[in-house]
Amino acid sequence: LKEIKMGLGSKLFGTHSEHEIKRIMPLVKKIEGYHDDMQKLSDEELRGKTAEFKKRLSEGETLDDLLPEAYAVVREAGKRVLGMEHFEVQLIGGIILHQGRIAEMKTGEGKTLVSTLPAYLNALEGKGVHIVTVNDYLAKRDSEWMGKIHEFLGLTVGVVLNDMEKPERQEAYNCDITYITNNELGFDYLRDNMVVYEKDMVQRGLNFCIIDEVDSVLIDEARTPLIISGQSDKSTKLYEMCDVLANQMKRGDDLPEYSKIDAIMGIEQEENGDFIVNEKDKVVSLTQDGVKKVESFFHIDNLADPENLEIQHNVILALRANNLMHRDQDYVVKDGEILIVDSFTGRIMPGRRYSDGLHQAIEAKEHVEVKRESMTLADITFQNFFNKYEKKGGMTGTALTEEQEFRDIYGMDVVEIPTNRPVVRLDLNDAVYKTKKEKYKAVVDAVKEAHAKGQPVLVGTITIEVSELLSKMLSREGIQHNVLNAKYHEKEAAIVEEAGVHGAVTIATNMAGRGTDIKLDDDARAAGGLKIIGTERHESRRIDNQLRGRSGRQGDVGESQFYISLEDDLMRLFGSERLIGIFNSLGVPEGEQIQHKMLSSAIQKAQEKIESNNFAIRKNLLEYDQVMNEQRELIYEQRKRVLAGESMKDQIIEMIKDRIDYFVDQVASNEMDKSEWNLVELNRILLPVIPLSPITADSVAEIKKSTDLKDKLYEKAVALYDAKEKEFPNPEDFREVERVILLRVIDRKWMDEINDMDQLRQGIGLQAYGQRNPVDEYKMISYDMMDAMNDSIKNDTIQMLYRIRIEKKVEREEVAKVTGTNKDDSAKRGPVRRSAKKIYPNDPCPCGSGKKYKNCHGRMA
């Protein structure tokens, strides 16, 4: 009913997009009004407009004031330089991007050309514009292709690629317009916040970005954070042992859905085998038998003991590696290395490693060299990163299905832009078969039929494995074809461009080659245009629509159809068991297609279920990262001040005062009788940090109040600090020492904090049992941890500065070496464990409070 009302409402009043386009049309007419004037200008005069616009900005005009004329200038430049003039719909898209919104434009509508309009306009401010694409190939192609327009108009254009060194990156970021991938952009931001000298930073601020394929960047990839990792000192033997054990363990049957009624009735679920795999949530759990097997293998009494946490963690990792991570689907093995395959694009991601030991577990499984485990040095989610921009716009062919998420998380609305020519592609109903074997045979038959009449075919697969299987089947039939998957993405663009030629057959993994147009030749058009065959429904309707959208660009003919079997993951994991049971009992002859409207709705429901599930995962990730983000902002702000060369003396004197006040408050107060002041305890906690002479009853005989005691100790501490400074011939040398030490302490403590917060997040799930919201609990504890970190930074910084010796030249250095970056899509991230010394309840608390661990931060552990 709600949908009928919505449909009726939009018929009567028009959709949100139609309203917005109506409001933009007067601006479009203004731009078109400049057409003749622009044509009359010489190249030199057209180029001169850039300087004129900059002058007008400096005199108080705004970008909005300049927009109509500036867009007309870019339009004319496009015609002169590339022979491409922006259509009306592209001008609309350009205005929407400048407004910081998302333009939904169908494939082949020239999104790349659209971005030149807002990029030019916003670059006039001189603060830099980032054009974000999904891969290096597109960044390079677009910077060379569209960059010609900007360079013709006198702007500088740069591109940042994965293999570039620091000087090249700095140069590219200093250009007016920079083309770059989302991953490089995020990792450069994190690396900039790890440098020890300001001159080593590469970015110059986050002003305006235009995100191409915005759904892929802000939705698909937002489920996992960007992580920069360094090496931990943990042995790799345990991974190999756990892999041996995992291969001896027996997988139990999947547990049926556990309903609320079962829980109320207290019905226990029967487990068998040593472990159970939940493919839906990508989780592995041990059964009672499995726990016993692990205990006997490692000769331990109780796997649940805290000291056996590492064994438990590694056994689960080995089981995940062997049961949930599939070769040639999630990763490939090449030259003795495990390379991650991006599950959205099907591309190999060199240099990426799964975090939390999963990569090592896969290395052990595949019998290649197990590399040292990594620990997290810096991380951020795409949500929090892109929200740091002053303004952001995005383009994609498919965004409306996720409009709610764009609004809620990024504050961006989606405006659907009409196509330049109507879409005439024929989208056929899904062809459903009982088994995968029958389905693949039907796909090959469909390819043969189309190929016989010269119709080009693009077969979209979800995994490398399936693309290779179909390739073998087509070869057996003698059909010449190209395969496009993660293994060959160097040839990607060339193969995609050829995919529209008469008689061409192309198999592509997922959305490999997205961003490159498939152009039809005349014979292909006559044969019915590009035929798209999807070999499986994707988790997301949006990605299915992207595959369909490869055909029928700019009013071309074409058709699309998905082939599905009841054995596909989507149907197996999320389809209704009852429905599948019905079709199995119908006794459909082998190889025959099943058609039923119940099936279509089951497929759509399954996809909606997964989409809302994935939205929940992203929202949950963001809620946790928001807490981390507050800490991250404070730490990065502090680092920036140090790097900028500000004097830190006032801040350090403030730290000294804070510590003295804190230590005195632990042992004395104005309300207490002076005889009750615990001076022994004060010496014990204060002197290791500030090396004053011991405080005795005689030395404080004149003092009556604890506030006076604080003042006296502060006076002495400052005098001692000034004396330390005088040991250095040049005060500026000591200022640099302060910066070096503060930087080193901040970095080390922040690294520990990231890993501690990670562990906290893993353990916090258990709090839900106590009827408390895990995120609220996480917030409360993390604020305490942050206070403890700040106290610890103050203690360590002061302690080191009072004890520094002049003969040793102190240099800034990174506290840990970066060994890699990571994009882990296999599961929710686990804790990144540090092999630090174990703290026992009666040990002094490492926060420096002087209390026993059990009475201080141990309370929260």
Please provide the spans of the model-predicted regions.
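Conserved P-loop NTPase motor core
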Residues: 5-587, 636-637, 654, 658, ...
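Generic anion/oxyanion-binding catalytic loop in active/binding sites
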Residues: 35, 432, 624, 739, ...
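Active-site-adjacent structural elements in folded domains
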Residues: 115, 443, 830-832, 840
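Extended, charged helical/alpha-beta scaffold domains that provide interaction surfaces
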Residues: 331-339, 345-352, 554-555, 562, ...
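Hydrophobic, well-ordered secondary-structure elements that form the walls
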Residues: 459, 507, 750, 786, ...
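Short Cys/His-rich zinc-binding micro-motifs
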Residues: 837-854, 858
